[in-house]
Curated annotation (Swiss-Prot):
GO BP, one annotated term: cellular response to hormone stimulus
Taxon lineage: Eukaryota, Metazoa, Chordata, Cephalochordata, Leptocardii
Gene: QRFPR
SUPFAM superfamilies for the chain: Family A G protein-coupled receptor-like
InterPro entries recorded: GPCR_Rhodpsn, GPCR_Rhodpsn_7TM, NPY_rcpt
Name of the molecule in the record: QRFP-like peptide receptor
Amino acid sequence: MMLGNMTFTQTILHELLRQHNMTKNEFIERFGLPPLVYVPELSPGAKTVTLVFYVIIFLAALLGNTLVVVVVWKNKVMRTTMNIFICSLAASDLLITIVCIPVTLMQNMLQNWIMGDFMCKLVPFIQTIAVASSILTLTGIAIERYYAIIHPLKVKYLLSKTRAGIILALVWVVSVGVATPMLFVHKAEEIHDFLYEQRFVTCQEKWWGQTQQTSYTIFNLVVLFIIPLLTMTSLYIRIAHRLWVQQPVGVTGNFAHGNSVRRKRQAVKMLVVVVLLFAVCWLPYHTVTVMNELTGLRLEEKSAKLLIAIVQLIAFSNSFNNPVVYAILNENFKKNFMTMLRCRVNRVSPQQVTPNTLQTPLEQSTRSCRLPAGAPNQQI
């Protein structure tokens, strides 16, 4: 705290109390001094709304993305190159769901950081990995679709399952590399308000200099958001031109060809929706982060806390969007999701087995839970 051109320290406080012959409380009341440390806190109403939405997002994202991984893992027919990429997306969303959402919720509920220095470093590290791997995986999917539709003769060589695995390994290595600075610039710090005798523990992001912090933020925005989105936009425009303009359904009279084009169109629609949702959900977060770095939010601290909580909530909501999109726009995923859910809910109990039943409850349950294979030509 500054008094004129003088920094207000504990030593100066004791000297002022001695000179004025006052207690600390009398001194505070006499001069109307505010706390030296102010940690903004959400209002009770905002906390309640935040809690409800975070719980909904957590449960929906955990269930949906787990179903995606299990469906692809258990069904050989579903293990296509693109579905391998989709599993990578689900893994990114599960990281955010399991690590980032609970800790961020706790941070919004409490004034003090109670998770220690390790979690203070881990959470932003994991969040950066997940966001970077998501956008790079989406770009990989767009490239895979581009070659599958525009250059179908090259796709089997250029993007086999093995090569897809190598590409995804590189995606995750790059994402870890991009996120590594988070381990060094975040730390849990105790702040002592010696005037009001309060102690707060906060998780702070402290760089070596403002230039490094701004450069890192701009790098993430441009290289890991704007450029990938522009790349995907260009690729999907070319794909759309090929499928909707150069290959109109019904012109050739070939029924099989028409069905193939329709399936490709449906897959492209689904992927474009996934990309749009990612962009819409993460754009507010990137915008607020860059504004804060370049100009400052210029808001009262409580309002800034609320704004950051809102954009975090919107960003995390993307974690459950993708499984919903797959269930609505892809028939294979929809059938497999329903089978998995029925498997959990409708298991046959011993009381349901009649004397005429030839199968044991276990056999009936196993048969009822078997995932539908789906025809190969229905894959996305």
